[in-house]
Amino acid sequence: MPHDLTAQDVKRIREKYGLTQQGFARLLGLGEASVVRYENGQKPSKANANLIRAADDPAFMKGCLERDGELLSAGQREKTEKIVYALISFDEDGDVMDINEMYEITLQQEVLIGQI
């Protein structure tokens, strides 16, 4: 069973992408006040905790940006996209992926998104 999501976890995940509380909330479809409360120690619902945990995965955030990136300011979106793409360009071992590995992952994501 995964540990409870702490206020520090929420803030760490948000800051990992250089997002404001408002930007993080918009990309995940949460209320800004909810993100503030979670970062101040209130426990999120199970559904929101799972959503925030999923946001720790750069590939998940890439999908959020593609779907709802227009909800961010142009500067915030550009900054976050650069961070996400930089995080995605490394594999699980921290090694730089070659273009073929990145292409394969992109194709897999497109297939998964198409099935949703």
Task: Give names to the regions the model predicted.
Residues 51:
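Short functional hotspots where side chains directly engage DNA or cofactors
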Residues 54-116:
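Long C-terminal interaction/binding lobes of large macromolecular proteins
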Residues 1-47:
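Extended interfacial segments that mediate partner engagement and assembly in macromolecular machines
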